[in-house]
Amino acid sequence: MIITIDIGGTAIKTGFMQDGKLTTLAQYPTDPKRENFSMLATLDNILDDILAEYPEADGVALSSAGVIDHQQGRVAFANENIPGYKGTELAAHIEATYHLPCSVDNDVNCALMGELSLPRYQAVDSALMFTIGTGVGGAVYLNGDLYRGPTFSAGEVGYSIINGQPIERVASTTALVAYVKERVDETVRDDVDGKWIFAQAKAGHAICQEGIEWLVQHLTTHIVNAVSLLNPEVVILGGGIMEQVDYLRPLIETKFKELYQNTLVLRQTEIAFAQLGNRAGMIGAYEVFKTKHPA
């Protein structure tokens, strides 16, 4: 039994993998703004709770926000969403404190590995994943393994430039909300979020439909550029708004075909949507653990 923990900027999800199945446990607030916040102390409290109930655990698999040195199990870089997180020695601390093997990897890397564990992807040798949320995240899987780069930053696509702007400013949920808020009547601006936009778009709201098409244009341009460079078998799209599959799939596929101009390299890439939701990171963390600590 392997404990799985998914560390995000606002919440920490927990569970365990046993016999290839995920059992979800409690979710804890990250609460990084509280006085004397310590991620290691927070994890200790969580692991104390879990191990009190499941003392038979054989290891700990972590998925985490930030740029992760998976070899050392440390946070190579993190922004101030989690203050003081950069440099945190996650694996070394857990292994020394609990005498359990530990693995750590980036959250989008783990999400991709979780999705690729599904039976439909068992023969896939190359894949990309993009997650659309507050920002835009990415992960790269080539020749049957995650590609992380020499500084563990492969997939940090939020810094990519589309039409002179970082992609996060034109293809994230945050960008979509800002686009719509600027254009709707001020009496409804406080209501505008991703769910509201899609509900209104489905009801025929022209500005919301226009905003989604604006996002899709930029996102699909980014996908075409990435696919042209790496020629993956599949691109998997995840994140909250990508759950709107019925609305987004035809828009994205149509724009993708329009942009790729029928070239062979792009025509053979499948555009897929994530299926595991919030479970992907924990399942993928387990997949990374198995590679680092083979039985």
Segments from the language model and where they lie:
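ATP-binding/phosphotransfer module of carbohydrate and carboxylate kinases, centering on a glycine-rich
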Residues: M1-G59, D69-R74, A96-H99, S117-S126, ...
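A short acidic/small-residue loop/turn micro-motif
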Residues: T30-P32, P83, A154-E156
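Conserved phosphate-binding catalytic cores of ATP/NTP-utilizing and phosphoryl-transfer enzymes
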Residues: A91, P101-A127
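A charged helix-plus-loop insertion that forms the helical arch/lid used to bind
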Residues: R74-G87
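Active-site nucleophile and cofactor-binding loops and adjacent substrate-binding regions
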Residues: E80-P83, S103-N109, M129-T131, A272-N278
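A cytosolic small-molecule/anion-sensing beta-strand core signal
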Residues: Q18, S64, L142-N143
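Glycine-rich phosphate-binding loop of actin/hexokinase-like ATP-binding domains
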Residues: Q122-T174
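Short beta-strand segments
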Residues: D6, A61-A65, M129-G135
